[in-house]
Swiss-Prot record:
EC number: 3.4.19.12
Region: Disordered, residue numbers: 1-46, 67-120
PANTHER family in UniProt: DEUBIQUITINASE OTUD6B, OTU DOMAIN CONTAINING PROTEIN
Segments forming domain OTU: 150-287
Residues covered by region (Variable-loop): 222-232
GO BP annotations, alphabetical order: protein deubiquitination; proteolysis
Assigned keywords, A-Z: Hydrolase, Protease, Thiol protease, Ubl conjugation pathway
Organism, as annotated: Xenopus tropicalis (Western clawed frog)
The name this protein goes by in its record: Deubiquitinase OTUD6B
Length: 294
């Protein structure tokens, strides 16, 4: 590989890393917006998750740069050999000096050993996770859904998961309501039926029921931020869509919201341990048996 080609590859790699860092910062901002500032427990977990995401990206970038560097010729060693040959005194038959290992090479070898140790720890953690809460929950939900000839349809964890899961279900029925539509209609319905929702909303700092101003902000956040949706929002959506919404969970019986409606229920999957931030909603789809039969 000549020097120009090497520089071009290195420049491309650095540009890629910059883009990935920008993308991660956008994701982090979305994560921050999805957790209320007064929810100290989830904010603390959020800080830990963000730190892990940034650390993982930093480690991967270092590994990629290290791999790139190892593909390049070692200029110190080449020059060392050349200098040794040109300094030979044939008359005195001086011994040829062996090229010394550069400091950069020593650092790379030390780094490689550290990364190998880290990879081994990650592998051990992955094995341990097979008995962890997240894996057990996923396995149990898969069995529950398989009995209905269904499987989980993964939904991004971005604060919109509940609305995205419902959007997916509606599209399967020919309904083109979007996440933005669902959020807007949910907020409008809750504001127009405040007496049905206010008693269930309390200030996490004082324990008091929301004031009218706090309730208005809550509804405004539904529309303007990726605020996480829960049972109150599901209740509103059930009335808006005039459809029952069934929530399947691993550790207890399904919850059905809007049982008064007779149309086919929308089915969601509630996962308590799916992500570091906690609760998450997925959608469902027909079970794909092709992999089992292949």
């Amino acid at each position: 590989m000549d020097e120009a080609e090497g520089n071009s590859e290195e420049s491309g790699l650095i540009k890629q890393h910059r883009k990935e860092k920008r993308d991660l910062q956008a994701k982090i901002q979305s994560m921050k917006n999805s957790v209320p500032k007064n929810d100290k427990k989830r904010r603390k977990q959020l800080t830990e998750d963000i730190a892990k995401l940034e650390a993982d990206l930093d480690v991967r970038h270092k590994e990629e740069l290290e791999a790139f560097a190892q593909k390049q010729p070692e200029p110190t060693q080449v020059s060392g050999i050349t200098n040794g040959v040109t300094s030979l005194d044939l008359g005195n038959e001086a011994p040829v000096q062996q090229p010394r290992q550069s400091k950069a090479q020593k650092r790379r070898e030390k780094k490689a050993a550290q990364e190998k140790e880290r990879d081994e720890r990650i592998a051990e953690a992955e094995i341990a996770n097979l008995s962890g809460a997240r894996h057990l929950e996923s396995q149990k939900l898969a069995r529950i859904l398989a009995e209905r000839e269904l499987q989980i349809r993964q939904i991004p964890s971005d604060g919109h998961c509940m609305y995205r899961a419902i959007e997916h279900q509606l599209r399967e029925r020919g309904n083109d309501l979007t996440v933005a539509n669902l959020r807007s209609q949910t907020a409008d319905y809750m504001q127009n039926h405040a007496e049905d929702f206010l008693p269930f909303l309390t200030n996490s700092s004082t324990g008091d029921m929301y004031t009218q101003e706090e309730f208005l902000k809550y509804c405004t956040d539904i529309v303007n931020t990726p605020a996480w949706g829960g049972q109150l929002e599901l209740r509103a959506l059930s009335h808006i869509l005039k459809t029952a919404i069934e929530v399947i969970q691993a550790e207890s019986s399904p919850i059905v919201i809007g049982e008064e409606y007779s149309s086919k229920a929308i089915t969601l999957v509630y996962m308590r341990h799916a992500y570091g931030l906690g609760e998450h909603y997925n959608s469902v789809e027909l079970l794909d048996t092709s992999t089992e039969n292949s």
